[in-house]
Each structure stands twice: as C-alpha cells, then as structure tokens.
Amino acid sequence: MKESVYYVGLNANNAIKNEDFFAGSFTLYPTQEKGNINFLTDVPKYGDEELFSKYQEFCNNKIDELLEQNPNTKIMCFNKKAKKLCVKFKDNFTKSNDDKLVDTLNNKFEIRELVKDVVPILNYFWIDDLTLSYEEIVQKFNTTTFVVQAVTGAGGTTTYFVNNSKEYDDIKNRTGKFCISAYIKNTPLNVTAIICDDKNIVFPTSAQLILSNNKNFMYVGGDFIYGAKLSDGVKKDIAKYTENILNVVKGLGYRGIIGIDYILTSDNTVMFMEINPRFQASSFLINMELKKLGLPCLAELNYKALNGIEIAENFESVTVDFAFLNCNQNTTFSQFENVDKVTQGYYEKNPTSVYRKIYNYSVLNNDIFEHI
C-alpha cells in the first residue's frame, strides 16, 4: 500500500498549505484542512501536563487505527515535544535531523560562533556573569540602548528592548544567561531555504513585521513585496551570506527546511542574527505560490531533502507578491485593507490561535513596525 505521511504536532502552523503532500494532520484544534484529526473543540479545563498526557493518549489511539488501515503510514514531527507525543511509533517516524544538532542551531550563541567567519554579525556580548551591572554594559558598548536575547526562543518572545537599569535587572533575574548587543535601527529580514545533499534551494526574502510590545519584539507577519524591492547590492549580499551559512549548516549534517534571520541597517549592511531550523511563519505564503506553479510544497521538499531523494524541479521563477499579518479578530490591523484571509489553522475558541490577513502591497513602512 502507498505510503501516507501525517503531520503530528501541538500547533497547526507547520501543517497548513501542505495538503498536496500530507495525508492528514494531528493537531490540538481543528485546522480546516484535509485529513485533520483534532483533539479539542473547546479550551481545556486542565493544566499543560495533563493536556499533553491526554493528547498523547489520543494520538496513540488514532495512529494505531491508521496503521491498521495502512501499515505504511508515516509520521512527521518537527520538534522533540511532537516526537514525545507519539514516541511509541518511532519506527514509523519519517527521517529527521538529529535533536542535538537542532538544539545547536536553535542556540543563538552557538550558531553565531559557527558562522561568524562567513557572514557579518552584530557585535554582541554573552553574559553568564549575573553580577555584571547595567552601567558596566553601558561602558562596554558606549550606548544606553540594548537588545537582550535569551539562549533560545522564537517569534521574539525572549527578545527584549532595554534602555535603563531597572529593565536590565528585571530581565537578568528572569532570564539568566543571555546575549546582549547595542540596539541599531534596522529592518529585520528572513530567508527560507531547503538544504539538499547536492544543492540548496533558496526562496524569496521577506521583511519581518515586528512590533515592539511591552519591551518585547513580537513577530506579527511578513512582507515579501518589500523583500523583492531591496537594492541589487543588498540582494547580492543576502544571496552570498545565505549560501555561506547553508553550507556551514550542511557540513554539520543538517538537511531540509531552515530559516535564516538577518537585519538590514541604514547603511545597507546585512548582518546575520539567528537560524530557525523549522518551518517559518511565512511558509504558507511560499506554499501558495508553489501550488500555483505546480511545484512541490515545502513539506514534500523537506521530506525529500531529509531522505536524499532528488529534487529535479527548478525554483528560480518563484516569487511571492504578498504580505501578511497575524490576526485574531477582524479589528486587528484594521488600518490596512486586506485582499484575502487564510484561516486554515485558526480556531476561534483557541485564544492563542491566529488567522492571516493577506495584502497585495507592502505594509512595512508604517511606524508601528521595526524598519530603517
């Protein structure tokens, strides 16, 4: 019987717009997509540990049923927590990257050390001496305004803007070991790529739409239209640095989908920030364009790259002429007129769920977003 691949995770974001590859998906809440098997239809009344345990039992029972129907059912998990949900079926997992390698790539300090010789990096200082004061940091960087990042974190949840000693002390006491750099006015950028044995497939650059919210930098969307309008010199630098970074990561043994974050400064300097060894929040827009062109979706490309299967298609013609913002109600970002919505993965009863408003124009150059 033909192999069928199911996505298993707590969050639907990795699965959406990959329906041409996935036979279905396991998620906490409904996703409105083909073959979705969801656990909840309402907000749970129990804590995180009990929720995980109950969801794990649910997944195990449903996977047993799928295997009875098709012994060639495979499970794709994108992180350790998802793998733990269905560890009973590890022999049915699709091939994935080594967990320790993924941890290394997620570590903001370790990855900067690995790529510092092949790409410009913002001057930073790694702090594990919690006795170091704000005043000493000011002297070291000759500025009073900083960005503080924890060792790991996604979507800006552990990235903070600091410009006084109280904020610095609060974060230091809460975070422990962290990375600190001088704040520079910038436009944050992201590149999605697929690392294969014989080549790297690089997709269009997007500007990241970042809000500074209660001293956090929160990712709320992406703007591919802005990315397409970057100068030829900046595009050339991004292409060169991306290839350099991908080859370093490939040398470590990593294969499949990956995201690279840069910042663009006011003098058009491109600097590396971090790696995201997973699907990006903007992946669904790339998938929509791939589908229009009759090309494989990112989940299929990820699967093939991990399994050493040749990818013969050419992706040089791929462009993404849209921007998007994450929303949880109609009034969110109502100042921008959208042309479409993507509601797959959104479930109204889930308070953390978002849908995407789609725009056919660049929205970055608005004062609410970080940009030069």
Q: Which residues does each PLM region occupy?
A:
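Active-site nucleotide/adenylate-binding loops and adjacent lid/helix of ATP-dependent enzymes
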Residues: 104-186, 196-199, 224-247, 372
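Peripheral (often C-terminal) accessory segments that flank ATP-dependent C-N-forming ligase machineries
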Residues: 300-372
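N-terminal basic/disordered segments at the start of proteins
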Residues: 6-27
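Short hydrophobic beta-strand segments
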Residues: 1-12, 73-77
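A long amphipathic alpha-helix within ATP-dependent nucleotide-binding catalytic cores
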Residues: 221-267, 306-328
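Conserved N-proximal alpha/beta basic substrate-recognition cap immediately N-terminal to
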Residues: 36-140, 154
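ATP-dependent carboxylate/phosphate-activation module, predominantly the ATP-grasp catalytic core
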Residues: 185, 193-248, 276-303
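Phosphate-binding site of ATP-dependent enzymes
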Residues: 160-216, 264-271, 323-330
